[in-house]
């Protein structure tokens, strides 16, 4: 396949390289393949931007992975629970540190605290669900969504490139999928649980947040070969 048009512009779609139907691929792979579009031209991406995007993807992947591990530890009462919880909360510190060079210590620490609350409430919610404590489940779910609203408002205020509505929709989807993941695990519906986690992997917020930071501080990420 020739990826160049007659006028020399680059117009290549990744999806064209993979045999259809796309239903044969897992959800994370489908997400990457099908979201690709034809671009009239290519864009130079600096190593700084590439590394920053990769770092954020890794940290949000750790976010959903360690959340899954703590759900497993709570549901099946595994002895590794305190160790898993400690490692999970490190993710909040790491995500805060991602903001530190751009927004300073106060904003970075505040963001880390909001993410920590998000993770702690999630663990408390799953614990209550396992015990069948409906009252606590309802209270913690309300608190969880209030925390999500606080995170969305916080990020949209510090970065004008983050749409509050889009961010809220994505974060609420993240909460809903995580809740479904816990429910299917508690019910020991393991295939459904795996299917939900596949969807969770496609919904991580890393690219949305990291791309907005790149746009806001573009001088720090600008490709040296751009004209």
List PLM regions with ranges.
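Early exported N-terminus immediately downstream of N-terminal targeting peptides
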Residues: 67-70, 77-84, 107-117, 122
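A glycine-rich, hydrophobic loop/mini-helix early in the fold
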Residues: 87-109, 113-115
């Amino acid at each position: 396949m020739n990826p160049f048009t007659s006028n020399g512009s680059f117009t290549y779609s990744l999806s064209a390289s993979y045999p259809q139907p796309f239903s044969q691929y897992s959800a994370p792979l489908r997400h990457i393949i099908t979201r690709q579009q034809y671009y009239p031209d290519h864009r130079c991406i600096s190593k700084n931007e590439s590394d920053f995007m990769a770092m954020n993807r890794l940290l949000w992947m750790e976010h959903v992975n360690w959340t899954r591990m703590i759900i497993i530890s709570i549901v099946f009462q595994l002895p590794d629970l305190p160790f898993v919880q400690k490692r999970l909360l490190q993710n909040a510190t790491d995500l805060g540190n991602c903001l530190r060079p751009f927004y300073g210590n106060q904003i970075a620490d505040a963001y880390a605290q909001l993410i920590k609350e998000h993770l702690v409430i999630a663990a408390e919610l799953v614990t209550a669900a396992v015990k069948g404590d409906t009252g606590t489940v309802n209270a913690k779910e309300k608190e969880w969504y209030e925390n999500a609203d606080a995170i969305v408002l916080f990020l949209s205020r510090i970065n004008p490139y983050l749409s509050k509505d889009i961010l809220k929709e994505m974060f609420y989807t993240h909460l809903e999928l995580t809740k479904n993941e816990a429910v299917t695990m508690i019910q020991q519906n393991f295939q459904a649980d795996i299917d939900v986690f596949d969807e969770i992997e496609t919904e991580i917020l890393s690219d949305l947040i990291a791309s907005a930071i790149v746009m806001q501080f573009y001088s720090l990420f600008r490709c040296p070969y751009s004209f």
